[in-house]
C-alpha cells in the first residue's frame, strides 16, 4: 500500500455488519488459513447489539484506509493465575489488502492501543506454521516468535501446527 499512515483502526458500525458477515462466511476470503466451515451468520449482529463488538473479554475493530474497508482485527482475554491476563489477537484482511503491509500496520496499531488502554504486560498472536506471510507481518510489527504448537488447529480434515508470537509492553518502549 502506498500510504500505510492512512491505515487506521476504528470501532465497528452497523454499516460494517454486512461486510463482516461476508468476510466470515466466505471460504474465498478466509482461505487458505482461516476457513473452518460454516458458522452462525447472526453472531456479529448479536454482538453488535449487545456491546458494539467492544466487550471486556473480546472485541473487534475495523481496519480501514479512508472509506476503504481492508479487514478487521480482534482480541480476546486469556486469564492466567491470580487475576492476571493477557490478550490474544488476530486479523482477517480482505484478499485485496494482503501483501501490501496492511497486516503489519494493523498489528502495530492494535498492540499500541491495547498497551495504552489496558494493564497487560503481554499480547500473543498465533498462526499456522505454513502461513509465512502472517509470520513475516508479526515479526515486522515487533512480535517475537516463541515456539511451535504441535497439532493446535483442526482445519480441512487434519490437525495443523501453529506458531506462537508475543510482544511485551517494554518491546514498544
Give the label of every model feature segment:
Residues 49-50, 112:
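Surface-exposed alpha-helical segments enriched in charged/polar residues
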Residues 50-62:
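A short helix-loop-beta-strand connector motif used in the catalytic cores of GNAT acetyltransferases and
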Residues 1-27, 60-173:
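Acyl-donor (CoA/ACP) binding surface of acyl/acetyltransferases
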Amino acid at each position: 500500500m502506498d500510504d500505510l499512515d492512512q491505515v487506521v483502526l476504528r470501532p465497528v458500525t452497523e454499516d460494517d455488519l454486512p461486510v463482516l458477515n461476508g468476510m466470515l462466511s466466505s471460504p474465498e476470503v478466509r482461505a487458505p488459513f482461516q476457513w473452518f466451515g460454516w458458522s452462525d451468520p447472526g453472531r456479529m449482529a448479536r454482538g453488535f447489539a449487545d456491546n458494539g463488538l467492544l466487550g471486556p473479554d473480546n472485541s473487534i475493530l475495523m481496519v480501514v484506509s479512508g472509506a476503504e474497508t481492508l479487514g478487521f482485527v480482534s482480541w480476546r482475554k486469556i486469564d492466567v493465575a491470580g487475576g492476571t491476563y493477557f490478550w490474544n489477537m488476530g486479523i482477517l484482511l480482505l484478499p485485496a489488502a494482503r501483501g501490501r503491509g496492511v497486516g503489519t500496520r494493523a498489528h502495530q496499531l492494535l498492540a499500541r492501543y491495547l498497551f495504552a488502554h489496558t494493564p497487560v504486560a503481554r499480547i500473543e498472536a498465533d498462526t499456522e506454521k505454513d502461513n509465512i506471510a502472517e509470520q513475516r507481518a508479526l515479526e515486522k510489527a515487533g512480535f517475537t516468535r516463541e515456539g511451535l504448537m504441535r497439532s493446535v488447529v483442526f482445519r480441512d480434515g487434519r490437525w495443523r501446527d501453529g506458531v506462537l508470537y508475543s510482544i511485551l509492553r517494554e518491546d514498544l518502549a
